[in-house]
């Protein structure tokens, strides 16, 4: 392992551990305050709720909700962050905003949506598509591993489970795919398409 690879690996691990740790701290605060943070979820088509799109991605409705999201976020987040901390943060922001806007526009009224699952679906989409966009064989292979490990989550974009925001999942996935193109190494205007490597 080269020093650069070791640095990227360590940075990715630190980032995702801090990110997930923050989710647990926020849930502890929510629990200790009688769920005072729950209103910061997304209430569809209310103008003042647009400001809650980002914080909603860091909040959960109970420990079971958070625990269900913790492992996939750790795994997919670490894989995505290996490309670089800056890239991960851009991908996360794009995904969270697209997912949140999708929920705000399409979710039923009344409802309240929060949780990291939109980001998880976004990271899934990003990791699967990224290798094809950048024509990197190693990333295509990584995307294949992601499909094997977490491909079954795609059922979550269908409206089959009451109380689960399929809208957040679907638009999170779309946001992740968008992020793969927007953060591509070949995104600069006039830059030739990358060759496979």
Residue positions per predicted region:
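A detector for small-residue-rich transmembrane helices and their helix-helix packing motifs
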Residues: 2-197
């Amino acid at each position: 392992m080269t020093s650069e690879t070791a640095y990227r690996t360590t940075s990715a691990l630190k980032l995702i551990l801090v990110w997930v740790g923050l989710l647990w701290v926020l849930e502890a605060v929510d629990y200790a305050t009688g769920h005072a943070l729950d209103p910061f979820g997304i209430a569809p088509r209310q103008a003042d709720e647009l400001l809650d799109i980002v914080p909603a991605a860091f909040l959960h409705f109970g420990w079971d909700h958070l625990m269900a999201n913790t492992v996939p976020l750790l795994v997919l987040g670490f894989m995505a962050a290996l490309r670089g901390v800056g890239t991960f943060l851009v991908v996360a922001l794009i995904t969270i905003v697209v997912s949140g806007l999708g929920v705000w526009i399409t979710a039923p009224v009344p409802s309240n949506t929060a949780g990291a699952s939109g980001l998880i679906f976004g990271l899934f989409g990003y990791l699967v598509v990224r290798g094809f966009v950048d024509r990197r064989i190693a990333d295509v292979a990584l995307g294949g591993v992601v499909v094997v490990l977490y491909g079954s989550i795609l059922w979550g974009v269908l409206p089959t489970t009451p109380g689960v925001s399929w809208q957040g999942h679907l638009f999170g996935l779309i946001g992740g795919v968008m992020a793969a193109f927007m953060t591509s190494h070949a995104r600069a205007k006039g830059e030739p398409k990358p060759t496979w490597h």
